[in-house]
Each structure stands twice: as structure tokens, then as C-alpha cells.
């Protein structure tokens, strides 16, 4: 029996690891799953845990008002050490590019515990866009022993960085596994305001740190202008809980009649709001991956993206945070049916709904079958104190 510990702290991580956790549980004859949450994002994380009926074995509950990235890193490093010592997992599994991912991987390295990185190999090639995610994932790739790349492009990025090809498995993205299950559900919104929307709906999400300040103001100016240009179109914005977002969005957008500002939605209603949308404006990485499966064109409110596959396929466009560009590209999609249909019809390059199965099979191949040994084994681990 081999023990696989899944460590995560935010809503996107939970969504993308949920299919893997469920798949691990289906292999309980050979793999024992242990779930650890840091609760880097408490409220938004808990809603996903409830949706997928995941009960953590350990909850570090590190979230605190106003804490910075250094605070999160230190808390994870200090608190997870005792969990690693108690459980002594054969593999620590992390997902993505959050501060939890980097800190949990570093702590595992200090304990000589192998690390598997789900969604490995994504690169924007700009260390400040997105911030801090680009550096988090690069550093995690240096630490990781197994790399689950969602696409061939991600695999190629890892190759160029010198990662051993035998440690890489191309899987597709687990977010599609979760999405396809949830999108098939019959659903009605609790809020009749959303149920009663007629006509075209533009869905907006924006929350990234690198956009705080002037870029965020530019995004909001574009939304206000578009709402006035298209009074028959409804613009729906689930506003992130971060004060840097809310303190800009509500004063600028709160009094426009066809802009609906709502609280962040739980995972299931948000997926169904995406289904209802005509166009999606977002800076979210996960939405860039999900939208093609729902046949929704995406305008990416960022300077660069580490997910170029959808842009290359033609289902997404990088529009940045410039007010004029956002207005121009959104107008194009609202008025040009041919262009809209072209973007909406691409095949999703990010997955087919079977990524979790590939991940667990590869883990079994590495751990159970021993066909490719992970270099550092349980009986060679050192007990080194964590230094931060």
C-alpha cells in the first residue's frame, strides 16, 4: 500500500484535484489517499469541498486578513512539517501555481519526500505576469519528481528546461474532468435575477494581482463603456472578495443598470453561468481552459498567458487591460456573427475528461509497479529541520 498526499489551499486547486482524489479513492486496494488543505482561501475553498464531498484529513486553516505572500509561505512551511512526519507519504501531490503549491513542495523536498506536480509546465516566460504564479510553478518544477503536463506545449516547456522525459506524463487538464460532470447537471440559480436574464450575457471575472491599480481601472472603464453602448446586453460580474478588486469595481460599475454585480459564486452555479454566457471576459487561467468545452469565446484580460493553446486554436484572444482594445474586441464579437461562431466552435485543446485516470495510472506505474523508481525512497529520508 502506497500513500499519496494531496495538498492544496485554494478553490481552483480543489476543483482540479477533486477528480484526482476521487480516482485515487477508486484505487484504494493499492493507494491510500490523504488530503491536506492549507485553506489559503477559506470561504471559496470550502464551497468546492462540499460540492465534491471531500473531507480533508488535515486542515491547516492559515487564512488571515491582510496576510502577504511571505506570511503564507512561512505558515505552510512551518505547519506542514509535522503532517509530513506523522503521515510519511510516498508521494506529495500538488496542483498548479499557488503559494501553497510552492511551499508544500519545498517542505516535502526538505523531508526527502517525492513530489508530483499536476498541471506542470505552464509558462508565460514573464516572471511578473502572472505574479507570483509564474515563479511558483517554475520553482515547483525544479523540486518535482513527477510532472503531469496538461498539454504537449507544457511538456515541451519542461523538456527545454532539462526535465527528464521519463518523469513527464501528458494527461490533459483535470479541470475538464470536473467541468463535464458538473455541466451535465440540471440546474436553476437561487437568484431569480440570473434566471430571468434575456438576451446576450457577457460574463466578467478579473482579480489578478498584477492588474491592481491602473490596469484594473482601465478594465472597469471598458465595461462601463460597453454597457452604455449595448443597453440590451447584460454584463454579469461575480466580484472577487479581495478588497483591491471590490474597492475599484463597486464605485465604478455599481450604478450602471445593465451591469449586475454579484458575490463570488460557488463552483456549480458559476459553471452554469458560463453556460448561459455569450462571451467571457476574464483573467482567470481556469476559465481559459473550461470555456472551449462550453463553446464560449474568451477575451483574456492579461498581457500574457501561460495557456497559449486556446489562443493558438482560435477560441481565445489576448486583449490585455487597455480600455480601447477591450471595447474593440468585445464589440467585434457582439456584432460579427461569423467571427463569433468561428471562436465558439474550436475543439478544447486542454483535455477530454480523462486526465485524472491518466494521472493515477502513472502514479501506480511509478510507485506500485516500480518500473521507474523514484530516486528518493522512504528508507533514505532524512529528518532535517525546516529553515525559513
Please report, for each region that a protein language model flagged, where it lies by residue.
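Nucleotide-activated sugar donor-binding and catalytic core shared by glycosyltransferases
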Residues: 1-237, 243-388
Amino acid at each position: 500500500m502506497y500513500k499519496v498526499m494531496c495538498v492544496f489551499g485554494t478553490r481552483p486547486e480543489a476543483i482540479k484535484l477533486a477528480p484526482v482524489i476521487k480516482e485515487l479513492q477508486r484505487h484504494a486496494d493499492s493507494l491510500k489517499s490523504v488530503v491536506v488543505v492549507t485553506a489559503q482561501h477559506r470561504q471559496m475553498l470550502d464551497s468546492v469541498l462540499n460540492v465534491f464531498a471531500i473531507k480533508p484529513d488535515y486542515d491547516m486553516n492559515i487564512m488571515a486578513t491582510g496576510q502577504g505572500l511571505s506570511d503564507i509561505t512561512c505558515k505552510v512551511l512551518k505547519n506542514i512539517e509535522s503532517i509530513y512526519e506523522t503521515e510519511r507519504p510516498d508521494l506529495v501531490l500538488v496542483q498548479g501555481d499557488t503559494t501553497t503549491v510552492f511551499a508544500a513542495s519545498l517542505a516535502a523536498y526538505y523531508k526527502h519526500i517525492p513530489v508530483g506536480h499536476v498541471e506542470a509546465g505552464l509558462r508565460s516566460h514573464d516572471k511578473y505576469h502572472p505574479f507570483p504564479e509564474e515563479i511558483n510553478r517554475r520553482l515547483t518544477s525544479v523540486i518535482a519528481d513527477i510532472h503531469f503536463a496538461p498539454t504537449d506545449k507544457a511538456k515541451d516547456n519542461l523538456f527545454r528546461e532539462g526535465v527528464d522525459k521519463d518523469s513527464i506524463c501528458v494527461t490533459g487538464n483535470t479541470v475538464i474532468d470536473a467541468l463535464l460532470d458538473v455541466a451535465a447537471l440540471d440546474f436553476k440559480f437561487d437568484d431569480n435575477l440570473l434566471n430571468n436574464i434575456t438576451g446576450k450575457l457577457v460574463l466578467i471575472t478579473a482579480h489578478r494581482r498584477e492588474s491592481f491599480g491602473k490596469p484594473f481601472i482601465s478594465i472597469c472603464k471598458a465595461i462601463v463603456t460597453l454597457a452604455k453602448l449595448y443597453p440590451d446586453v447584460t454584463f454579469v460580474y461575480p466580484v472577487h472578495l479581495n478588497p483591491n478588486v471590490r474597492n475599484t469595481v463597486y464605485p465604478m460599475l455599481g450604478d450602471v443598470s445593465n451591469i449586475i454585480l454579484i458575490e463570488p459564486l460557488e463552483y456549480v452555479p458559476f459553471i452554469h453561468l458560463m453556460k448561459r454566457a455569450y462571451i467571457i471576459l476574464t483573467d482567470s487561467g481556469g476559465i481559459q481552459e473550461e470555456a472551449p468545452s462550453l463553446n464560449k469565446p474568451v477575451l483574456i484580460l492579461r498581457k500574457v498567458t501561460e495557456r497559449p493553446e486556446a489562443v493558438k486554436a482560435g477560441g481565445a484572444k489576448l486583449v490585455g487591460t487597455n480600455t480601447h482594445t477591450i471595447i474593440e474586441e468585445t464589440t467585434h464579437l457582439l456584432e460579427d456573427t461569423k467571427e463569433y461562431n468561428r471562436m465558439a466552435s474550436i475543439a478544447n485543446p486542454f483535455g477530454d475528461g480523462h486526465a485524472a485516470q491518466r494521472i493515477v495510472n502513472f502514479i501506480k506505474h511509478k510507485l506500485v509497479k516500480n518500473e521507474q523508481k523514484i530516486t528518493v525512497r522512504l528508507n533514505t529520508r532524512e529528518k532535517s529541520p525546516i529553515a525559513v
